Amino acid sequence: DAVMDVMLPSLREERAQSYSPFLPLHPKTNRVMQVSIDEVNRSRGSIIWTDPETGERFESPVTGGHCKLQWKPDWAMRWVALGVDYEMAGKDLIDSVKLSSEIARTLSGEPPEGFNYELFLDEKGQKISKSKGNGLTIDEWLTYATPESLSLFMYQKPREAKRLYFDIIPRMADDYLTFREKYPQQA
């Protein structure tokens, strides 16, 4: 109930009508079911739901691997259960971090310290997207340059958006070698 009290105000009205932090796994197919919950049985720690294809009703315990959590409550639960004390997230997830932090406190836990970073952009300044294929993978970078050059790229100005594209690799590799060469003279 406490998690629902945090989640419901963040949802559109239509979504709030059917929302549950728990997604039951179908006992016959093991599929994650995105269904409305018909009833909550707190004494047994279970939810009752109806298979939309067959009309069959099931009661699923919310523990023991019988349910999956929706991602925002899941994030908070992991923080609390695993004692996570530091979490990085892209700026596009700031609101989700705040919501998950509130859920963690509701569960008598402490949310982790955080760091929000800017997103990566392609050479045209557009947000990198896996589906568009306009990005560069770590493996691709490491095919052409060292892990240290990648670290230099990642840790320079972490709160600024970075353009990540192939032509940046040689520049970062050269910059790393230059910094490494000059370090003894500056130390």
What annotation goes with each model-predicted range?
Residues 2-138:
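Active-site cores that bind ATP or allylic diphosphates and position pyrophosphate for catalysis
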Residues 92, 97, 118-187:
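Catalytic adenosine-cofactor/nucleotide-binding cores of aminoacyl-tRNA synthetases and other
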